[in-house]
């Protein structure tokens, strides 16, 4: 019996790390009656039920999804074959307790693995530092100690510093502390990337080099925020964004926040209530002046704000983005007297203080929120190499959450930047659809596994992978964001009708000029498609029940059986009922929970349109939500521009919260520990990238297979930065190249003194007398060419067979072909063959006299004309040659996208004349 229970338990010890392994549990939906019964069972006190006490769990203070070497897809060679092997990076979760912390890893197999667990007092912030970028001129002083863990504890290593005033760096390889950074004021958060370690203080920011941990720069002009983030910042791969306390006009970028213009019934009612409140406040001020007492309606915070405004005129809602590589050392000061070195952008984002912000993976999109939490702004940052004043900041979206106030604590992007999830302290995660380039989200943009091309229906690819069949079978056309276009491969988007927004999009994407010039992008207001609510009470999730669904996109967890005190919250949270939430997008891992006996399909993750959303709350339960966008069900007709709706449902859950009975898992770790293996792999890749000798290698690493390719004075800094120098903003090319249309023709120029067979099946020759002198190719004046003197096939059939019709040969002789690219029509009274050169006087007449009145001769001459006609070169642009009996009709239509030539003609089967000494020349239609 005990063995059976041990087998069914979702927890078991890990073989490689020694920690705990938690298997995912399937989430089952309950009916309304089952939910009511479960609620009544939870409300009944434990003493009346007589059931044993549940397992006690430790209190969680904060949760976070971490990015480290373990899930670094760019530098870990294990993930470079991600598309072929199906290998996906694991999810890395950090949980902070009132006594210690814990680190979990969830690989693609779905089994959560405990990697680290300690109990050393309260921990306010912790980060697993990624391996830094280094080269020949920049070495990593802690390479042998990595991976490193940065921790901000209540009691530092020295024991004499104030609480939360030092950052201790521990080696997970050896277990020793390698560095301690002391501060005089409390630390509120830690951020890190491959270049720097950022320590966030109140109204200050300090950055340290990731290789030496020496101070690189610091910022002292941050605007204070009441919480939950006392000093909100956003750290990308290279840029750092923070809230500035003033707006400096000389550094202000073009653009910034636009008016939201959101008017609703709720907003009107709340505005009226605020107006009434302001009126009552004015009455209270009059009472204050008469009685000399402070009315109860005015809080101390309001007085402090007014006093601060009198001392120093601070401006809320200002964002400054700096480049951590070029900002220089020392203090970063944005003032009228300072230069703009290292300042990327400086712009107003909100009217209220900024509460939270986050970059997307590319660093070009920035989402900001204010303290009210009504609206979230999405900005596109287009930099300029000269100064921040030349930078353009486009306000693409306003994500409208609601009219009630809420504090934002977490923001995350999907990997393709088409979805944004904003989580508040109320435990609600709001899912918004966006486009990386702006525009209204719709079926065309969010119902495909790919980010659709904005300007064309075609999937622009380098040919590295096959185009998925869903793009052509399930979607209209080829997922073009431009409505009303033909799905034909040759259809030009210029023939479609564009609305005002699409016209602007065409202008901005095709305009290689200044993005600061008008018209600026029009602001889009987007509502959330899903609101996923977290439970307000902690519950025990069993294998049978699991979380319970109370509605689409809203679930609740079973309440505990025994009475417990309210959960402990973060030190920065002062209001009751607030708890921490973190979210991230990732590949589905619920297949194991739903089909434990089946194997994972190889390409199962590539078939979904949206990745799964993972949400973890302060109760230690990680839940995977499946997201299924679909066209709006109330839409009368489904088209490319149909709005979206979304269905969300929980699929699997992991109970990661630890109990007091769990053992600690502390370094030093074994060599096969996942964190150590990932650190070794990333450092090895860094050595190869810098051209250095990795530790343990038998010999030097050379580039291009030759040691001579590395010069003695080779600069490793240039090789180190080659990835960051890749252009990340490009401009789309024209929809139709010049040579794709009928406005150009390919013609053959024959020099004098040669005889050329025009067609292998034709007897038409081009020859000269022996007295002629050969001339080099294209060495002549076009004005000297007398095309009217050419006698090239002077007899041809009429376009329409008319009885008794006869025209002189001289009427049609030597007239050049005219093709109008705009209208797509041909001049039917012209010949189809043009040859530049001179012919013997009697050659054409002798050839004509033998076949002039025979049908066979007519067919042969037409075949020769087709073999050398310019119309063969523009077949794809709309020219179509059809044969009906003995009548050949040359027709063209601007709407046609494919051409056809009768294959029973000899000229169609005969190849073009090939002569290596006679290249093809490109001439416009107007060539004489």
Swiss-Prot record:
Chain residue numbers at which the record places covalent cross-link Glycyl lysine isopeptide (Lys-Gly) (interchain with G-Cter in SUMO1): 215
Effect of substituting residue 370 to A: Decreases recruitment to preautophagosomal structure in response to mitophagy. No effect on interaction with PHAF1
Annotated region (Disordered), positions in chain: 472-515, 755-777, 868-928
Location (main, coarse): nucleus
Single Gene Ontology BP annotation: autophagy
Region (Required for recruitment to preautophagosomal structure in response to mitophagy): 254-312, 437-560
Disease: A chromosomal aberration involving BCAS3 has been found in some breast carcinoma cell lines. Translocation t(17;20)(q23;q13) with BCAS4.
Protein name, per record: BCAS3 microtubule associated cell migration factor
Taxonomic path: Eukaryota, Metazoa, Chordata, Craniata, Vertebrata
């Amino acid at each position: 019996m005990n063995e059976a229970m041990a087998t069914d338990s979702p927890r078991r010890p890990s073989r490689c790390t020694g920690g705990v392994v938690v298997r995912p549990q399937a989430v089952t939906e309950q009916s309304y009656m089952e939910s009511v019964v479960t609620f009544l069972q939870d409300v009944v006190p434990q003493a009346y039920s007589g059931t044993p006490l549940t397992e006690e769990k430790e209190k969680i203070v904060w949760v976070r999804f971490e990015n480290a070497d373990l899930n670094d897809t760019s530098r870990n060679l294990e993930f470079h074959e991600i598309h072929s092997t199906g290998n996906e990076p694991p999810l890395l979760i950090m949980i902070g307790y009132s006594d210690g912390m814990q680190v979990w890893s969830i690989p693609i197999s779905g089994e959560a693995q405990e990697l680290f667990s300690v109990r050393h007092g309260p921990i306010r912030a912790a980060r697993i530092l990624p391996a830094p970028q280094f080269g020949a001129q920049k070495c990593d002083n802690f390479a042998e100690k990595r991976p490193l863990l940065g921790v901000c504890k209540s009691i530092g290593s020295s024991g004499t510093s104030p609480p939360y005033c030092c950052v201790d760096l521990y080696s997970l390889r050896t277990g020793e502390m390698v560095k301690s950074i002391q501060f005089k004021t409390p630390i509120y958060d830690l951020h890190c990337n491959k270049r720097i370690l950022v320590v966030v203080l109140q109204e200050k920011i300090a950055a340290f080099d990731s290789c030496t941990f020496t101070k690189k720069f610091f910022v002292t002009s941050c605007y204070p925020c009441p919480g939950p983030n006392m000093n909100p910042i956003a750290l990308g791969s290279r840029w750092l964004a923070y809230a500035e306390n003033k707006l400096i006009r000389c550094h202000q970028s073009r653009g910034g926040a636009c008016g939201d213009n959101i008017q609703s019934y709720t907003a009107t009612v709340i505005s009226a209530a605020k107006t009434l409140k302001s009126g009552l406040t004015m009455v209270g001020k009059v009472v204050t002046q008469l009685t000399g007492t402070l009315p109860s309606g005015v809080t101390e915070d309001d007085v402090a704000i007014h006093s601060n405004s009198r001392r120093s005129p601070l401006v809320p809602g200002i964002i400054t983005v700096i480049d951590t590589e070029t900002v220089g050392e020392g203090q970063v000061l944005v003032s009228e007297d300072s230069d703009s070195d290292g300042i990327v952008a400086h712009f107003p984002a909100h009217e209220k203080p900024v509460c939270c912000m986050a970059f997307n993976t590319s660093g070009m999109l920035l989402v900001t929120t204010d303290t009210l939490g009504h609206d979230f702004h999405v900005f596109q940052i287009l930099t300029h190499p000269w100064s921040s004043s030349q930078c353009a900041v486009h306000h693409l979206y306003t994500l409208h959450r609601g009219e009630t106030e809420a504090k934002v604590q977490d923001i995350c992007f999907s990997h393709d930047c088409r979805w944004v999830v904003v989580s508040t302290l109320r435990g609600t995660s709001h899912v918004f659809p966006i486009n990386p380039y702006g525009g209204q989200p719709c079926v065309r943009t969010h119902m495909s596994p790919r980010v659709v091309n904005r300007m064309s229906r075609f999937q622009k690819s380098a040919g590295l992978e096959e185009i998925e069949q869903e793009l052509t079978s399930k979607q209209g056309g080829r997922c073009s964001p431009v409505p009303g276009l033909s799905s034909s491969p040759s259809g030009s988007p210029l023939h479609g009708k564009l609305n005002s927004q699409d016209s602007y999009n065409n202008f901005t994407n095709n305009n290689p000029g200044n993005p600061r010039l008008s018209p600026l992008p029009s602001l889009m207001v987007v509502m959330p498609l899903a609101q996923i609510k977290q439970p307000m009470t902690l519950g025990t999730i069993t294998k049978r029940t699991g979380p319970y669904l109370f509605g689409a996109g809203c679930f609740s967890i079973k309440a505990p059986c025994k009475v417990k005190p309210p959960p402990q919250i973060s030190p920065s949270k002062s209001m009751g009922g607030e708890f921490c939430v973190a979210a991230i997008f990732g590949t589905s891992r619920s297949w194991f929970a739903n089909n434990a006996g089946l194997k994972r399909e190889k390409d199962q993750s590539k078939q979904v349109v949206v990745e799964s959303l993972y949400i973890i709350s302060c109760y230690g339960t990680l839940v995977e939500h499946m997201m299924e966008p679909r066209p709006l069900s109330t839409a009368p007709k489904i088209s490319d521009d149909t709005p979206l709706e979304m269905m969300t449902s929980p699929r699997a859950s992991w109970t990661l919260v630890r109990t007091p009975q769990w053992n600690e898992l502390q370094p030093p770790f074994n060599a096969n520990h996942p964190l150590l293996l990932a650190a070794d792999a990333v450092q090895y890749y860094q050595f190869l990238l810098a051209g250095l000798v990795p530790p343990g290698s038998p010999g030097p690493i050379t580039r291009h297979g030759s040691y001579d390719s590395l010069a003695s004075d080779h600069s490793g800094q240039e090789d180190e930065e080659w990835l960051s120098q890749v252009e990340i903003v490009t401009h789309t090319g024209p929809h139709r190249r010049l040579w794709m249309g009928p406005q150009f023709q390919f013609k053959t120029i024959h020099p004098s003194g040669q005889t050329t067979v025009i067609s292998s099946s034709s007897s038409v020759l081009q020859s000269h007398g022996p007295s002629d002198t050969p001339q080099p190719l294209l060495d002549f004046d076009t004005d000297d060419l007398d095309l009217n003197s050419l006698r090239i096939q002077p007899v041809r059939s009429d376009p329409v067979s008319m009885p008794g019709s006869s025209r002189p040969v001289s009427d049609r002789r030597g007239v050049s072909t005219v093709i109008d690219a705009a209208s797509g029509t041909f001049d039917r009274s012209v010949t189809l063959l043009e040859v530049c050169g001179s012919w013997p006087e009697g050659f054409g007449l002798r050839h004509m006299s033998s076949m002039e009145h025979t049908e066979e001769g007519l067919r042969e001459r037409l075949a020769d004309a087709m073999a050398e006609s310019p119309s063969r070169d523009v077949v794809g642009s709309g020219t179509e040659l059809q044969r009906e009996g003995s009548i050949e009709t040359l027709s063209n239509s601007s709407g046609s996208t494919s051409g056809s030539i009768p294959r029973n003609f000899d000229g169609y089967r005969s190849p073009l004349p090939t002569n290596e000494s006679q290249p093809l020349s490109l001439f416009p239609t107007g060539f004489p």
